[in-house]
Amino acid sequence: MVLVPKYLNFESDLAESVTNSMDSSLPDETTSDSIILTTFNDFSNWARLSSLWPLLYGTSCCFIEFASLIGSRFDFDRYGLVPRSSPRQADLIITAGTVTMKMAPSLVRLYEQMPEPKYVIAMGACTITGGMFSTDSYSTVRGVDKLIPVDIYLPGCPPKPEAIIDAIIKLRKGVAREVHERKDKLRQTRRYFTLNHQLEIVPIIHTGKYDEHLFSKFSEISIEPKLNVSPQRIEKSKSSISSQISF
């Protein structure tokens, strides 16, 4: 590669050229400039990052934000994304929404049917950690990375379409720097892939016993009538009411 900037020599006041010590990228000087020299790995990465085909997988409100990308306002076709309905034709799955225990085997089956190399974007708080269902829900998976490996985490409730585009751009940058042999080493070796979250452990508050002190206070209070009404007066009022109803 040759750089030809100009500078002035203060002694001779003449313009001279500066040539760096790097060799030319062309094999020889007769090679045309229209030839591009690259490696097969770089060419494969360029082709894959320019044509990511996502699998439509939405189970909650996050998918509404993802569906807005298809419209003309955001137009994610400019990034080469073509939505597919079959996992065998997709290389990207965006899990948008809550993943339940009943849906977990189906999600794993869809991921296994996708051809290699394949990528996963976890979209939304419900997909990443379970969201608002992570405290006391018996049927929610606390993170989709317990089922399949995740490449990009996209937090939000729900994330905006601009955030989804930013996640896709970051995934494209990761694909551009990827080495095929390195991706094979990271392939899932067991059915349920588990990752430990870096979250702070807090004491359990939903134990069902946090209202016992309130119930004990109410049980100690004795309710006594403040009006001293004789039983004869009560019977007299009942008879008068019944006589009025009969008329």
UniProtKB/Swiss-Prot annotation:
It catalyses: a plastoquinone + NADH + (n+1) H(+)(in) = a plastoquinol + NAD(+) + n H(+)(out); a plastoquinone + NADPH + (n+1) H(+)(in) = a plastoquinol + NADP(+) + n H(+)(out). It holds the Pfam family Oxidored_q6. Its cofactor is [4Fe-4S] cluster. [4Fe-4S] cluster binds at C61, C62, C126, C157. It is a peripheral membrane protein. PROSITE patterns: COMPLEX1_20K. Its EC number is 7.1.1.-. Its main location: plastid. It is an enzyme of class 7 (translocase). InterPro entries: NADH_UbQ_OxRdtase-like_20kDa, NADH_UQ_OxRdtase_20Kd_su. It comes from the Eukaryota. GO terms for molecular function: 4 iron, 4 sulfur cluster binding; iron ion binding; NADH dehydrogenase (ubiquinone) activity; quinone binding. One of its GO terms (cellular component) is chloroplast thylakoid membrane. Keywords: 4Fe-4S, Chloroplast, Iron, Iron-sulfur, Membrane, Metal-binding, NAD, NADP, Plastid, Plastoquinone, Quinone, Thylakoid, Translocase, Transport. Signal peptide: none annotated. Binds 1 [4Fe-4S] cluster. The keyword rRNA processing does not apply. NDH is composed of at least 16 different subunits, 5 of which are encoded in the nucleus. Belongs to the complex I 20 kDa subunit family. NCBIfam families: nuoB_fam, PRK06411.1. This is NAD(P)H-quinone oxidoreductase subunit K, chloroplastic. It comes from Anthoceros angustus. The gene is ndhK.
